[in-house]
Amino acid sequence: MQLIVRKEYLNELIELYGTPDIKVITGIRRSGKSVLLQEFVSYLQSLEEAVNIVMINLQELEFDHLLEYHALHKYILDQYKEGMTNVLLVDEVQLCPQFELAINSIYTKGIYDIYITGSNAFLLSSDLATLFTGRTMEIKVYPFSFVEYLTYYGITDRYDEAFDQYVRTGGMPGSYVYKTEDRQYDYVRDVYSTILIRDLVEKYKIRNKSEFTNISEFMMDNIGNLLSPNNISKTLKNDQSEITRKTVSKYIGYLENAFLFYEAKRYDLKGKKYLANNSKYYLCDTSFRYAVNGTRNMDFGRVYENIVCLELRRRGYEVYVGKLYKKEVDFVAKKREAQIYIQVSDNISDEKTFEREYSPLLAIRDAYPKMIIARTHHETYDYKGVQVVDICRWLRE
C-alpha cells in the first residue's frame, strides 16, 4: 500500500513535541493513526539531538507480553535512557486493560514525552480528562480528504472525474489497494462490522445486535435529516421494531463514541443559542453508506452535505445547523472568532432550487461570510454578497 505524508496531522504532532501533555491520537478504525505515528517516528529519527524512541504496537505479537498493565509499565521504565530525550509511543493502547494506570504512572515521573493512539470507544474525547492525571492534547484523525485522495493517486487534472469517484469510494485509505469498487466496499463493510461487533457490541454488552445495526443503518440512510431519539424510535416502531427512546439515545452515543457518526446540533441564529432537540448526524466517511446500504439511492445532495461537514471539521471548525425562524441553513461553521454560513446543494442550475438555497443566507443580518457550495462546474462567483463555489474546487482550496 502506498503511503502519503499527512502533513496537517504530522505538523500538529511536531508542534506538540517536547510539551508535557499526553498526546492522544483518536479516530475511526483504519483511518491512518498507526501510519501517522510511523511518520512521526521518521521525523524524530531525522533530528540531530539524541532521541530514545520507545515504540510499542500492542497489535503486534512481539508485544503480546505487554497486554497487562504492570508488564507494560515495567517495560517502559526498562527502556528509559539517561541523557537522552525519551519519547514513548504506544499504538492501540486500549488493548492493554487498565492501560491508564501504567501511562499515568509514567507521566507522573516526567521522564517521557508520551504519544498514544486508540481506536473507537476506548479513547473518548469526553473521557480523556478522567482517564489521565496529566493534561491531554487530542489529535483527531479523519479518513482521507479529497486533497489526500488526489495526492494518493497522483491526480493533477480532471478533478471532476476524480471527485465523482471519491464521492462513491470515500476516504478509507485501506480500501485503495483494491482495484474494483466491489472489493473496496467489501473492505469498508469489514471495517464497519468490526466496529459494530467487536468494538461496540462487546464493549457495551449489547444484547440485541440486529436492533443496534438497524439504528446505525437508519442513520446512514438519513444523513442530513433532522433526527432525534424520539422520532427514530417512532419510525422503527412503525416498522415493527419495538425500541425505546432511551435505548435509541444510548445507541447513538455508542456510534458517536466509535467516531462513526458526528453530530451537528441546531443553533438558533436569532436567539444566539443552541437548541437541544433534533440534530443532524453525518458519517465519518460516505463510503460506509454505499458499502452497507447500497448505491441505488445515491442522493448526492445529502452526500455532498456529509463531505462538506467532514471537511469543515478537518479544517478545525465546529459545525452546527442554523435555524432562522422557519428557514434552515445547512451549516454554521465556527472557529474562534470566525463564522461562516454555508448552504450545500448538488445542483443549483434550476432557478427555484437556487432561490431555495440563497434565500436563508440573505435573511441573515450580519457581516459573516455566506457561501453556497454546489456542483456548479464553474468558476467561483458572487450573488448578492453570497459566494457561490463549486464543491470540487472548494475541497481543493
Pin down the residues of each PLM region.
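Hydrophobic anchor at the beta1->P-loop junction of P-loop NTPases
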Residues: I25
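Pre-Walker A adenine-sensing motif
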Residues: I4-G18
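Hydrophobic positions on the alpha1 helix immediately C-terminal to the Walker A/P-loop
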Residues: L36, F40
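Accessory nucleic acid-recognition modules appended to NTPase machines
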Residues: T180-Q339
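Domain-level recognition of nuclease-like catalytic cores that cleave nucleotide substrates
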Residues: H377-E397
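Interdomain motor-coupling "hinge/lid" segment immediately C-terminal to the ATP-binding subdomain
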Residues: S119-A121, S126-L226
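Conserved lysine of the Walker
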Residues: K33
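Short glycine-rich substrate-engagement loop in P-loop NTPases that contacts/grips substrate
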Residues: V54-M84
